[in-house]
Design a protein with these regions (language model features):
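A short, structure-level motif marking secondary-structure boundaries and short turns
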Residues: 50-52, 89-91, 207-210
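Aromatic-lined substrate-binding rim segments of carbohydrate-active enzymes
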Residues: 63-131, 135-136, 220-229
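Glycine-rich anion/phosphate-binding loops
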Residues: 58-64, 95-101, 152-160
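Acidic-and-aromatic substrate-binding clefts and catalytic sites of carbohydrate-active enzymes
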Residues: 30, 55-61, 87-88, 92-97, ...
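Conserved residues at the C-terminal ends of beta-strands
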Residues: 52-54, 81, 183, 239
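Substrate-binding/catalytic cleft of secreted carbohydrate-active enzymes
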Residues: 17-18, 24, 118, 123-154, ...
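N-terminal carbohydrate-binding accessory modules
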Residues: 1-77
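Conserved, mostly hydrophobic/aromatic
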Residues: 43, 70, 78, 109, ...
Length: 311
């Protein structure tokens, strides 16, 4: 007769520190770091709940109200695009006032104890005009989103301007900026040069230019060097980590951004209803709570009835 055994023992996965190049300490000694399973803040597991807010697309008088609402909803990190063509619409003339005042926005986040990730582009997409690139860049004799020296000259100048605006607001300074994203959807997505729409219909290259993976990674490394030289020194540097994007994993942390709602599918006019998406994982516990509440009421009524009978 055969003997059978059931082994219910489960080997737990080992957890160990990793990504030593992506960490930082603030003046209070609090530490941001990573293990192979999760992010840590002050040596404890930290679950970052991000909510996008693009400051330059909203009236600055209302920023604080919106930040408070986001925090009340459970958001503890606000990533924000810095959209180049909002700040340098005219070549060489930068605007950082009013609704373009990135410093004021970050200071409000600090006031309400919300961390910040700066998404500095230079290309951000974000459904912005030219993906955020200024119109005047179209007329420059250079290949954007490449290692073209002329393009990199303008990018470096732009990064220096950003760095001047947010100086002293990084995590190492006691500020809320914990991360910097370099480009966006690099080698994955481009955008139309809007001024050519309806005529030549030209598009901004996604950055691939049929060059090697090593060259793509080198581009991200150059952007990181420019950011650091501009004073944008953060614990975390990120890049798009999906759809064939090149994020240089030894330089930045590849991140996946999922969409519960896919607006682009409605370009196909035959689609009338939005399908369930894999990013939309939700369980409605409210119905369960209602059922439990009703059961508790019935149980209380039953106990009162028993006491009345016994009494």
């Amino acid at each position: 007769m055969k003997n059978y055994q059931i082994n219910l023992k489960k080997e737990l996965n080992s957890i160990y520190p990793t990504l030593e190049h992506l960490q930082g300490v603030n003046p209070n000694g609090e530490h941001i770091s990573f293990t192979n399973h999760y992010m840590m803040k002050d040596e404890k597991p930290f679950f970052g709940i991000c909510g996008e807010f693009h400051y330059s697309r909203y009236d600055f008088h209302k920023w604080e109200d919106e930040i408070i609402k986001m925090k009340m909803a459970g958001i503890n990190i606000i990533p924000t695009y810095i959209i180049w063509n909002h700040h340098e619409e005219i070549k060489g003339q930068f605007r950082w006032d009013g609704s373009f005042n990135i410093r004021y926005f970050v200071e409000l986040c600090k006031k309400h104890q919300v961390e910040v990730i700066l998404r500095i582009g230079p290309f951000v997409h974000g459904e912005a005009r030219n993906g955020g690139l200024p119109d005047w860049l179209y007329g420059e004799p250079c290949n954007v989103r490449s290692n073209d020296e002329r393009y990199l000259f303008y990018v470096k100048r732009y990064y220096q301007e950003i760095g001047n605006q947010v100086r002293g607001l990084f995590y190492k300074d006691g500020g809320p900026i914990i991360g910097v994203q370099l480009d966006n959807e690099y080698c994955h997505a481009g955008a139309p040069w809007e001024m050519t729409t309806g005529t030549s219909n030209e598009w901004i290259n996604n950055g691939s230019y049929d060059t090697s993976v090593e060259e793509h990674h080198h581009h991200i490394e150059i952007l990181k060097e420019f950011a650091i030289e501009a004073g944008m020194i953060a614990p975390i540097y990120t890049g798009t980590g999906w759809g064939g994007a090149q994020a240089s994993p030894d330089t930045v942390l590849p991140l996946w951004g999922g969409y519960a709602f896919w607006p682009w599918i409605f370009y196909d006019e035959s689609i009338k209803e939005h399908p369930v998406t894999p990013e939309f994982i939700y369980r409605n516990y409210r119905r369960l709570l209602i059922i439990l509440n009703r059961l508790m009421i019935r149980l209380q009524c039953l106990l009162l009835a028993v006491k009345w009978v016994e009494g």
